[in-house]
């Protein structure tokens, strides 16, 4: 009896030790892969700069072009810039996430990805998590600069609690789009096809969301498409948080004849979107490389 108890304790100790060693190696892999991506960014800072300049141009040009458009959000009547600004924040994070697979597909074309896949990695998911972490940091840096410019234009920041929740919505979108972008890099043969798909998806996803116009201004068929767009479930909560000093997760974001949504439901939809992307990534990674 004592012998069995002793073996059981030794088995548990070995499992705990193995788990801690596994976690250590995973973090080490993650650190090295993320460090490599930041070294690439340091050598090619145009990625960071262009990710800031493009949304700024959209904010300045579209904000001026539709400044007198009769949109109304909360008590902010006829202020298109205030309406458009959350859409630009989301577009900044979305564009960076959509382009996140470009370094990976170049790694594959130059043979570096094959070296990673045959290396004794603790987990191949470190490839996904390193890209997601890097893109999250890069996107939040870009969003931070857009926020500073928005303050310069007279757009007030929301309360700290609302700001944290806004960042969390952006983080969920970044994770989901990054996952699907990396899936494209694994499935498409070369960077030419990937860039073509990115160009095809970029603007249609933006225009079919509520970034440029509210749902009330859209025809019925476009409202349905917009309700299927993950950007909408990031833009609408952030827009609400920017225009309301007090809110609840049950606060309604929009109501249509066939659909209504609140902040909490938007959060759940984005979490499901991320989980679906992660499960697809896991399945495709195994089918391709195992």
Swiss-Prot record:
GO terms for cellular component: ATP-binding cassette (ABC) transporter complex; cyanelle membrane. Keywords: Cyanelle, Membrane, Plastid, Transmembrane, Transmembrane helix, Transport. Its main location: plastid. GO terms for molecular function: ABC-type transporter activity. Pfam families: ABC2_membrane. It is a multi-pass membrane protein. Signal peptide: none annotated. Belongs to the ABC-2 integral membrane protein family. This is Putative transport permease ycf38.
């Amino acid at each position: 009896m004592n012998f069995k108890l002793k073996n059981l304790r030794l088995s548990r100790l070995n499992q705990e030790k193995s788990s801690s060693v596994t976690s250590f190696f995973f973090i080490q892999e993650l650190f090295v892969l993320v460090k490599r991506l930041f070294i690439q960014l340091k050598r090619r800072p145009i990625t960071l700069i262009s990710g800031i300049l493009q949304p700024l141009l959209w904010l300045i040009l579209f904000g001026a072009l539709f400044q007198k458009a009769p949109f109304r959000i909360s008590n902010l009547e006829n202020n298109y810039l205030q309406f458009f600004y959350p859409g630009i924040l989301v577009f900044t994070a979305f564009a960076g996430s959509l382009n996140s697979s470009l370094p990976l597909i170049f790694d594959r074309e130059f043979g570096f990805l094959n070296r990673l896949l045959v290396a004794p990695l603790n987990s191949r998911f470190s490839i996904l998590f390193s890209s997601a972490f890097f893109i999250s940091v890069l996107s939040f840096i870009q969003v931070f600069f857009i926020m500073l410019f928005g303050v310069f234009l007279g757009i007030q920041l929301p309360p700290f609690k609302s700001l944290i929740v806004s960042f969390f919505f952006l983080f969920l979108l970044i994770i989901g789009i990054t996952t699907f972008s990396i899936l494209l890099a694994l499935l498409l043969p070369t960077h030419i096809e990937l860039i073509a798909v990115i160009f095809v998806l970029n603007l249609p996803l933006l225009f079919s969301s509520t970034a440029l116009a509210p749902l009330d201004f859209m025809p019925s068929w476009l409202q349905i498409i917009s309700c299927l767009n993950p950007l909408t479930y990031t833009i609408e909560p952030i827009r609400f948080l920017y225009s309301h000093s007090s809110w609840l997760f049950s606060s309604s974001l929009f109501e249509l004849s066939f659909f209504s949504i609140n902040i909490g439901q938007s959060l759940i939809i984005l979490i499901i979107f991320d989980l679906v992307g992660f499960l697809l990534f896991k399945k495709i990674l195994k089918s391709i490389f195992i």
